[in-house]
Swiss-Prot record:
Tissue: Expressed by the skin glands.
Alphabetically ordered keywords of this record: Amphibian defense peptide, Immunity, Innate immunity, Membrane, Secreted, Target cell membrane, Target membrane
Family per record: Belongs to the frog skin active peptide (FSAP) family. Plasticin subfamily.
Species in which this protein is naturally found: Leptodactylus laticeps
Compartments where located: Secreted; Target cell membrane
Domain-related comment: Amphipathic peptide that adopts a random coil conformation in water, a beta-sheet structure in methanol, and an alpha-helical conformation in trifluoroethanol-water. Plasticins have huge conformational plasticity. They can display random coil, alpha-helical, beta-sheet or beta-harpin structures.
One cellular component (GO) term of this entry: extracellular region
Protein's name in the database: Plasticin-L1
Disulfide bonds: none
Role, per record: May play an immunomodulatory role in frog skin in response to microbial pathogens, since it increases the production of the pro-inflammatory cytokines TNF-alpha, IL-1 beta, IL-12, and IL-23 by mouse peritoneal macrophages and has no effect on the production of the anti-inflammatory cytokine IL-10. It is not known whether stimulation of cytokine production arises from a non-specific interaction of the peptide with the macrophage membrane or from interaction with a specific receptor.
GO biological process: one example: innate immune response
Residue runs in coiled coils: none
Length: 25
């Protein structure tokens, strides 16, 4: 997700691969 991806960018992981890429995708 966008929100989860952006927040996860700080943590270094998240939905869709994590990080900024995860936020965009």
């Amino acid at each position: 997700g966008l929100v989860n991806g952006l927040l996860s960018s700080v943590l270094g992981g998240g939905q869709g691969g994590g990080g900024l890429l995860g936020g965009i995708l």
